[in-house]
Each structure stands twice: as structure tokens, then as C-alpha cells.
Design a protein with these regions (language model features):
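A conserved donor-nucleotide-binding helix/loop in the catalytic core
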Residues: 61-94, 102, 190-200
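Conserved donor-nucleotide/metal-binding helix-loop-beta segment in metal-dependent transferases, i.e.
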Residues: 100-139
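N-terminal anchoring/stem segment of glycosyltransferases
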Residues: 1-72, 80-87, 250-263
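Long, low-complexity C-terminal extensions of enzymes
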Residues: 226-263
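Catalytic core and acceptor-binding pocket of nucleotide-sugar-dependent glycosyltransferases
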Residues: 145-232
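Active-site regions of enzymes building and remodeling cell-envelope glycoconjugates
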Residues: 51-64, 111-119, 223-228
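Short, solvent-exposed loop/turn segments at secondary-structure junctions
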Residues: 10-12, 45-47, 63-64, 98-100, ...
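A structural signal for short, well-ordered beta-strand segments and their strand-loop junctions
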Residues: 40, 91-95, 118-120, 160, ...
Length: 263
């Protein structure tokens, strides 16, 4: 069984790669029947252990800045669509700052008689009513979800499923992003708003609890399985440091977007 890991670490986010990779090699799908293929989209000239592990595929990816690094992540994945179809049976996207903390196996693999999708409940909306979910509420957006709809609020940081099903998700969301862009709309929470819309229409076969996206330093009523490392910790440089590389370009883009919206 071939498991594809989709991972983006442009700019200074490559600081998270080594520990993510080592934790995956220790805890994620370590049964001998699984082969892990790492598809790492980065502008870094070198990745930890790539010279020793032929299953680490470094794919050149420029830093798109905010919000495109998240909004267009599905466009990024589809750049290697044919390769993913050839080389994987399952695909999972993990945010750069995640860390596996205990063994994970077949419980994350949707069955062949399901729609083949997996989503993860956002820890900030655990046990909250859907009246508190911050879905996209603008009717003009492709991510629009009406009040009263939606059973869960899904996080953007971990999703996946059978390769065919997940690539269909990527294709559909890309078309939505492009349609919104043509109408000068950016969904409120970017890719997360769009994935919530997709999962409303196509409820995932597996919905993981927030134990699989457990924010560092939080107190939730379960043991963390995958930790969200705190970007503000000194060893990572802090949130502003991680985004600083493209800060000027981001400001220029935001000004341009405001001008377009004002026209």
C-alpha cells in the first residue's frame, strides 16, 4: 500500500521539516505493508535526509505569500497529478508545523466502498454548535454555506483519502478558487472555507477528532495524536519571522486587491 504525504514548506517553514519527517518515520503507517512517499513542495535547495531516502520527492515551489500559499495549495498538488496517480493509493496533506506523537495506522484509511475522503474537526470548534462555525457566508462565493447547515467545522491542516477521491477534491476546489478570483472574492478562511463547502456536499467517510490536530499548549479532553506546533515559540522564530520573507510582496498584493474591489 502506497501512502502519499503532501507537504508544503516554502520560505522559512522548512524549519519544521526535519522533526515532522522523523516523527512520521517513527509513528505514521509503520506497518511493513505501507510505503511512505513524501512529496515536499519547497523553495529550499535541500531537505533533511533526501540523499538517503529515495521516497522523499523535493518539488520546486516558489513562495506565493499570503494568502496564496494556503488558498492555492490544491493548485500546487495538481502540478504533479499524474505522478500522484501513478505512485500512490492514498494521499494525505499535513500542515508544515504538525508532529506525530503516537502510532497511527489503518484507522486513517477510508474503505473502498466509501467516498474515500477524510477530514479533521477543527480544535477551535470542538463541541460547538454550528451557529458558531465561521463558514463563508457571502452568497457570491463558491464556499458559501447557509446558516444552519453543517455538522462539523473542518480544519484545513489535515485532509486526505483515496488518491482518486482526493484528487477530485483538489480539482473541484481549484475550479472554485479560480471562479472566486474572477469575481474578486477571497473566501474568509481561504482553503479551509472551501474544504468545508466540499465536505458539506461530500461528507467524508472518516472524520477525525481534534486529537489529530491538537494545538500545543491547549487542554482538550483527549490525548494528542498529532500535535500542532506553536509557531510563536522562540525555536521557530515566531509567526512574523516565518512570514517575513514575502512581507513586502504581500502588502503590494493586498493593495492591488483593495484597488480591484473598489473599482
Amino acid at each position: 500500500m502506497r501512502i502519499g504525504i503532501l507537504y508544503i514548506c516554502t520560505g522559512k517553514y522548512d524549519i519544521f521539516w526535519k522533526d515532522f519527517y522523523l516523527s512520521a518515520e517513527r509513528y505514521f503507517m509503520q506497518d511493513q505493508s505501507f510505503i511512505l512517499e513524501y512529496y515536499v513542495f519547497t523553495d529550499s535547495p535541500q531537505l533533511y535526509d533526501e540523499e538517503n531516502n529515495e521516497h522523499i520527492h523535493r518539488i520546486k515551489q516558489k513562495n506565493l505569500g499570503w494568502p496564496d500559499n494556503t488558498l492555492k495549495r490544491f493548485h500546487t498538488f495538481l502540478r504533479i497529478k499524474e505522478q500522484l496517480e501513478r505512485e500512490t493509493d492514498y494521499l494525505f496533506f499535513f500542515n508544515a508545523n504538525l508532529l506525530f506523537t503516537c502510532p497511527i495506522g489503518k484507522e486513517m484509511l477510508p474503505s473502498s466502498n466509501s467516498n474515500g475522503l477524510l477530514g479533521t474537526i477543527h480544535p477551535g470548534f470542538y463541541n460547538k454548535p454550528n451557529s458558531e462555525f465561521t463558514y463563508e457566508r457571502r452568497v457570491a462565493s463558491t464556499a458559501y454555506i447557509p446558516e444552519g447547515k453543517g455538522l462539523y467545522y473542518y480544519a484545513g491542516g489535515l485532509s486526505g483519502g483515496c488518491t482518486e477521491s482526493y484528487l477530485q477534491l483538489c480539482t473541484t476546489i481549484c475550479s472554485w478558487v479560480d471562479k472566486d478570483a474572477a469575481n474578486h472574492i477571497i473566501p474568509i478562511w481561504h482553503d479551509e472555507s472551501l474544504i468545508n463547502k466540499y465536505f458539506l456536499d461530500n461528507p467524508p467517510a472518516i472524520t477525525l477528532p481534534p486529537a489529530y490536530l491538537y494545538p500545543e499548549g491547549w487542554s482538550l479532553p483527549f490525548k494528542p495524536i498529532i500535535l500542532i506546533r506553536d509557531k510563536n515559540k522562540p525555536e521557530y522564530g515566531g509567526h512574523e519571522f516565518l512570514r517575513r520573507k514575502n512581507s513586502l510582496w504581500v502588502k503590494i498584493k493586498l493593495i492591488c486587491q483593495k484597488i480591484k474591489l473598489a473599482d
